[in-house]
């Protein structure tokens, strides 16, 4: 009747330390019924994880026999997506927010979801009215070189997963 309490471990709205702590988010039975379920191998171990895509979150579960373990939920919006590289152990969520692009790379190992890194770029206004890019890696400004190598490692060459 009242739904169940789903604990969100990662919230892509927030880069800070609180994002890892997460907060309880009530997922109603209606949202669960309306949600779309996908089965994908996100970590290259040849076992498919269960992804419940509800209105605001992608919720990840592992299944072993008849046991189901909730790994976490990641906040999504319309322009977001997920890429995955075949045998790679990581998968990357990307979020587009106006002039900002954020990437969140996760790994699932032994049924535990951990954040590998976050990186992104942001278009800024210079004092002379021109535009320039600022790059970030794990919440800190970084060089163009570091950003490009991280981008190549995690965000290119993978296939985009359809969550619809």
Model-predicted regions and their roles:
Residues 35, 76-84, 125-129:
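Repeated scaffold domains used in trafficking and secretory/extracellular systems
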Residues 1-43, 150-164:
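Terminal domain-start segments
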Residues 1-5, 93-164:
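Acidic, small-residue rich beta-repeat scaffolds with periodic aromatic anchors
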Residues 47, 55-58, 77-78, 98-103:
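Short, surface-exposed coil-to-beta transition loops
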Residues 69-92:
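Long amphipathic alpha-helical scaffold regions
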Residues 52-53, 62, 83-85, 107:
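Well-ordered beta-strand positions
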Residues 58-72, 106-110:
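Beta-propeller blade repeat segments, especially FG-GAP/WD-type strand-to-loop junctions
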Residues 42-53, 86-94:
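Acidic/hydrophobic-patterned starts of short beta strands in beta-sheet-rich repeat architectures
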């Amino acid at each position: 009747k009242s739904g169940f309490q789903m604990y969100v471990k990662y919230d892509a709205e927030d880069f800070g330390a609180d994002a890892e702590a997460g907060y309880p988010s009530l997922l109603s039975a209606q949202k669960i019924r309306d949600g779309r379920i996908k089965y994908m191998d996100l970590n290259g171990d040849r076992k498919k994880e269960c992804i419940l895509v509800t209105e605001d979150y992608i919720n990840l579960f592992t299944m072993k026999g008849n046991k189901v373990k909730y790994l976490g939920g990641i906040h999504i919006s319309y322009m977001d997506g997920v890429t995955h590289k075949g045998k790679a152990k990581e998968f990357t969520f990307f979020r587009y927010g106006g002039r900002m692009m954020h990437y969140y790379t996760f790994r699932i190992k032994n049924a535990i979801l951990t954040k590998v890194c976050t990186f992104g770029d942001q278009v800024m206004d210079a004092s002379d009215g021109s535009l320039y890019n600022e790059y970030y890696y794990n919440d800190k400004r970084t060089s163009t070189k570091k950003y490009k190598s991280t981008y190549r490692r995690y965000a290119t060459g993978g296939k985009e997963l359809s969550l619809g």
